[in-house]
Protein backbone atom coordinates (compact mmCIF):
# COMPACT_ATOMS: atom_id res chain seq x y z
CA UNK A 1 0.00 0.00 0.00
CA UNK A 2 1.49 3.42 -0.93
CA UNK A 3 2.16 5.95 1.85
CA UNK A 4 -0.59 8.44 2.64
CA UNK A 5 -0.33 11.85 1.02
CA UNK A 6 0.43 14.84 3.21
CA UNK A 7 -1.77 17.91 3.18
CA UNK A 8 -0.27 21.03 1.60
CA UNK A 9 0.20 23.66 4.31
CA UNK A 10 2.13 26.33 2.41
CA UNK A 11 3.76 27.31 -0.85
CA UNK A 12 7.40 28.27 -1.22
CA UNK A 13 8.75 29.66 -4.49
CA UNK A 14 12.52 29.54 -4.98
CA UNK A 15 14.57 30.23 -8.07
CA UNK A 16 17.81 28.30 -7.80
CA UNK A 17 19.99 26.55 -10.35
CA UNK A 18 19.70 22.80 -10.73
CA UNK A 19 21.98 21.05 -8.25
CA UNK A 20 22.77 24.30 -6.42
CA UNK A 21 20.48 23.80 -3.41
CA UNK A 22 22.44 23.93 -0.16
CA UNK A 23 21.53 24.22 3.50
CA UNK A 24 23.11 27.68 3.62
CA UNK A 25 21.03 30.88 3.54
CA UNK A 26 18.73 31.80 1.91
CA UNK A 27 17.51 28.30 0.93
CA UNK A 28 17.95 26.50 4.27
CA UNK A 29 16.15 29.00 6.52
CA UNK A 30 13.33 29.50 4.00
CA UNK A 31 12.61 25.77 3.97
CA UNK A 32 13.21 25.25 7.69
CA UNK A 33 10.65 27.78 8.85
CA UNK A 34 8.01 25.89 6.87
CA UNK A 35 8.95 22.52 8.34
CA UNK A 36 10.61 21.09 5.23
CA UNK A 37 13.41 18.59 5.84
CA UNK A 38 16.32 20.60 4.40
CA UNK A 39 18.68 17.66 3.89
CA UNK A 40 15.97 15.68 2.09
CA UNK A 41 15.28 18.65 -0.20
CA UNK A 42 18.95 19.24 -1.03
CA UNK A 43 19.61 15.57 -1.83
From Swiss-Prot:
Secretion signal, residue range per the UniProt entry: none
Subunit structure: Part of the ribosomal stalk of the 50S ribosomal subunit. Interacts with L10 and the large rRNA to form the base of the stalk. L10 forms an elongated spine to which L12 dimers bind in a sequential fashion forming a multimeric L10(L12)X complex.
Keyword Ribosomal protein applies: yes
Pfam family, one: Ribosomal_L11_N
This protein's name: Large ribosomal subunit protein uL11
Mod. after translation: One or more lysine residues are methylated.
A cellular-component GO term for this protein: ribosome
Matching SUPFAM superfamilies: Ribosomal L11/L12e N-terminal domain
GO molecular-function term, one example from the UniProt record: rRNA binding
Assigned protein family: Belongs to the universal ribosomal protein uL11 family.
Keyword annotations of the record: Methylation, Ribonucleoprotein, Ribosomal protein, RNA-binding, rRNA-binding
Function, as annotated: Forms part of the ribosomal stalk which helps the ribosome interact with GTP-bound translation factors.
Lineage, broadest ranks: Bacteria, Bacillati, Actinomycetota, Actinomycetes, Kitasatosporales
Organism encoding this protein: Streptomyces galbus
Keyword Ribosomal protein: yes
InterPro entries per record: Ribosomal_uL11_N, Ribosomal_uL11_N_sf
Amino acid sequence: MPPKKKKVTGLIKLQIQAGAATTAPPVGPALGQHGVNIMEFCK
